Each structure stands twice: as structure tokens, then as C-alpha cells.
Amino acid sequence: MSGKIEYISGPVVKAELPGARLYELVFVGEIKLFGEVVRIQGEKAFIQVYEDTTGLKPGEPVERTGEPLSAWLGPTIIGKIYDGVQRPLRNIEEISKNPFIARGIGYDKAPPLDLKAEFDFKPAVKPGEEVYPGDVLGSVKETEPMTHYILYPPLPEHAPGVVEWIADGKYKVDDVIARVKTKRGVVEVKMWHKWPVRRPRPFKEKLPPVEPLITGVRTVDTMFPIAKGGTAAVPGPFGSGKTVMIRTLSMFAQSRFIIPVLCGERGNEAADALQGLLKLKDPSTGRPLLERTTIIVNTSNMPVAAREASVYMGTTLGEYFRDQGYDVLVLADSTSRWAEAMREVALRIGEMPSEEGYPAYLPTRLAEFYERAGRVVLYGSKERVGSLTIAASVSPPGGDFTEPVTSNTLRFIGAFWPLSPRLAYSRHYPAIDWLVAFSRYVDTVEVWWSKNVSPEWRRIRDALQSILVKEAELQEIVRILGTEALSEYEKHILNVAFMIREGFLKQDAYNPVDTPSAPIKQFLLMKAIYTYYEEGLKAIESGVPASVLRELETVKRLPRLRMEVTNDVAKEELTKFIESLVAEIRATTNRRG
């Protein structure tokens, strides 16, 4: 079960390792560095090492483990901060006595779960009941907002059976909490189990994503929505607001569990994001957001190979909580760094490069990642539903959206929120370019908006989007001929588009009144602007100039409403405002008439 190192090239080690399997976890060298077999040629194995290989030399041993890189899943996972291979960073800091991660710290020294922690276990089944893989056996209260459900793991070796023994009481995470008698023998179930990170967890059926994931960001929720179980990408160059966007989603998205994966970002930026996440309060409960969050951090100065593992690790943790019946959101920042790590390892093991040096299987890996999202009927005997939503930022060099990572990502996602440097530099945040962005979920979430907010939602949303497109066309004329060449109708279009941009699309992420924006507030803000557009058209037909309409007191207030009206009084306040807006425009029309 062991071999010897033959040569070392950065994070890649070639070793003579008879019997090795693809993606098997191995320990490299005398200090036992984490590694994973990524290519096999005869008796030779190419290993990507998840730790710094400095000081390794040919001839040192390589030990096989016989199992793939796996996530440890069970209580004490919530609130943890892990590295890319699920080692808890706080524990590593205590062991290392150093802000940098010491090498050779394995799961024996820093286990991902606190196996000695005790919890009050409450059974959900009784002795004699039949259970299937994926069924809930019981639960423990891990944090105030999160109940941790203990599953009969859907592992290949587990078969349906009858509960032989289960009892409530105080148990350690590593204790046996149930025994299930199957045709293959008696299975002892503990509170935790392992799952290979590259293998998607099973489910019965994939359902269409029909319920929107409300994020509190108006541009996202109304114009380019994402559904629970959907996928989204946030590409943008440096300084365009990707990290703030990810922070806003992590704080306000209406998911029960959130997993931010900071993959290959700058250390200082990751530290700032971490400090911010640790201080954040859950707006719905007022308790620390960390009580329903697990964070994975893999900064750019950490070993490059661990970036790839971090994305798979985050997705596996997300699937685990999805299997408990929760709506889960995985936020990856950024997949470009993940792809760069893939490129470096592929080139070092001698694989044929494709476009811009990326491996030919880049589209396949991106598809495997995004396709793990979904709203699904869960494995087990009872009808349960859970969802895993994936939103990932992309960092294209120079903001070039035609580069391979961005262009291939476009093939597999349902919502595209590109960040424009032009908008960011003009201090328009979130800097989502409404002329390039798209969402494939508008049709599927329309039923939810019609039922829960207003049947007019789709009609008004489409009208506002058309006005923004028309504005872009008119701006070309204005640049050449000026506004004097425009008709009153066209001037009105420009005025309305300004209101949409300033009073609806723009949003201050740090203003508690402006962010988050409740669905009813979003709709009524949109309706107020659309009312200005509709009533304004009638006034212009009656001879009222667009410039007069723009100077009305209620119209002047339109861009400020988002900052003045809170979510709890939005329905009453904005309904009154729309009535006063209609009254003032009609009064002006009557006077001019």
C-alpha cells in the first residue's frame, strides 16, 4: 500500500505506486502531505499535493489510503471555517502556533468534526420501523436556527432494513445512535459519515426550479431572478463589486444554510470578507449569521491544488444539508482561480493544453460543478424536497467575457449577472449590466410572483426592461445630435429610464433601508416608475412637455423612495405615493388643457 516518489514538479508529484486508483487520497513524503491521484500510467501515479511540496525529495514514501478524498458530514460542521480539504483553520492555528498553516497536519491532529462533542439526540423513528438510505433517523439541535437531522446515509453499502435499536439521550458525535438490520447484516449508524467530494449525492428526482430565491437585491430578484435550485454566475473585472455582491447574497438570500467558498482570492481580501461574515447578524433572527453558515477558505498563497478540492468540498457540504430538506446556497468566489489551478496541474502532468492553456476537459468540470445544483425529491421512503443553489463569481482577465472560463460557464448557468466596470466607476452598484445580463428563470418564477405579490409583475417588469433597451438606442442619437433632436415621447423615455436606474436598479448594500428590499417593496417601486411612464404618455399626448413632468414634486421624489420607505410600511406608503403621483400628473394635464 505504499510507493516511492520519482520526481517533483511544483504541486505535482510522480510516484511509483502499484495498485493506485484514480482520485485516491494518499500521504506524500515523510511528513505525510495530503495528495490525490489525478493520473495513472501503468505502475506510475501522478499526484496533486494539497500542501507545499518544498523540501520533498525523490525516494520518500507515498502511502495509499484506499479511499477517495471525502468530506466528513455530521454535527459540529456548522459555524466552522475550513481549508480546501476540510481541515478546521482555528484548530490548525492552535497546532501551528503560526498564522500560516504548518505542513503535515492530518485529520488525526485536526479532525473536521469534533467527534467528542455531546448532543441531545431525538429519534424520528422507532424500533421495528423500516428505513431506507436517505431517511431521517433523528435530530440534534446544533445551533439556535439550525436543527441537524441525522440521516441513514445513502452509502452504496447501506441497504433498506428494519430499525433494531434506537433511543434518545446524550450521545457523542462518534457514538452509535441506531442499529439497522438489513439483508447484508446489522448496520451501526453514527451521527456522522464520510462522502467522496467528487461524487454527487443521490436523489430520486430533479424538480423544475419554480420558487425564486429572494436575495433582497432588486436587479436580481425582479429583473434577472434566480430560482431555488438554480445556478448563476457573476463575472466582472477587478473592482467591479463581486465580493460585495457575494457578501450581500450570503447575508440576505432566503436560504436556510449558506456555504461561502473563498477559492484562490487574495489573502487580505479573504480576511476582510471573513471578518465581515463573522460579524454579520441574520436579519430574520438577529443571531450571528455563522449559526447557519460553514465557510471554506483557500487563499491565493495556499497550495494551488487545494483550490480544486475546495469547490468540490463546498458543493458536497451543500448537498448534505440539502438532503436534510433545507434550501442551501453555495457561493464560490471565484471559479476562475479554480480553473487556473486546474490548468497548472494539467500542464505539469503533461496533458495537452486547449484554449489559453486550459485543459480540454474544462467545460466538463464546469458542467459537473453547476449540474450538482437543483431542487430535488430526496432519497428515502418519505416524500421530502430540498434544494441546492449555486452562485459563482468569475474573474476574467481584463474583463474579457470571451475567455474560456466565462464563455464555457455561460453554457451551464440559468442566470448571468455580468458586472460592468463602466457602471462601477460611475458608482452605480450593484454594477450588473442590464443590457447583457439574462435569466432563464423568469418564466418559471412568474407564477410565484403572480400568486404572492401581484399578477401585474411580469407585464411591468418586461415594460421596464424594454424602456432600458430603448434608452440605450436613444443614447446613440443623443451623443451625435443632442437631446434637441428627440421628440417629447423619446425625452420621456430617457426620463423614465433615469428613474429606473436611480430609483430601482441602484442599491446601497450598506444601507439598512435600501438593502434588503422585500418583494412587495420591489414590485411597488417598479409600479410607481411604470405609473409615471404610463400617465406621462397620456399627459404628453395632451400637450404637456416631458420637462414639465420631470419637475413635478412626486416625480422628483421617485429616485429617493428606495432610501426612504422601509420594508414594513412599503405597501401602505408606496400605494399612497402612487395615488398622489397619478393625481399630480392628471392635475397638471388638466391645467395645461
From Swiss-Prot:
One of its GO terms (cellular component) is plasma membrane. It catalyses: ATP + H2O + 4 H(+)(in) = ADP + phosphate + 5 H(+)(out). It is found in: Cell membrane. GO terms for molecular function: ATP binding; proton-transporting ATP synthase activity, rotational mechanism; proton-transporting ATPase activity, rotational mechanism. It is an enzyme of class 7 (translocase). Produces ATP from ADP in the presence of a proton gradient across the membrane. The archaeal alpha chain is a catalytic subunit. Component of the A-type ATP synthase that produces ATP from ADP in the presence of a proton gradient across the membrane. The A chain is the catalytic subunit. This is A-type ATP synthase subunit A. The gene is atpA.
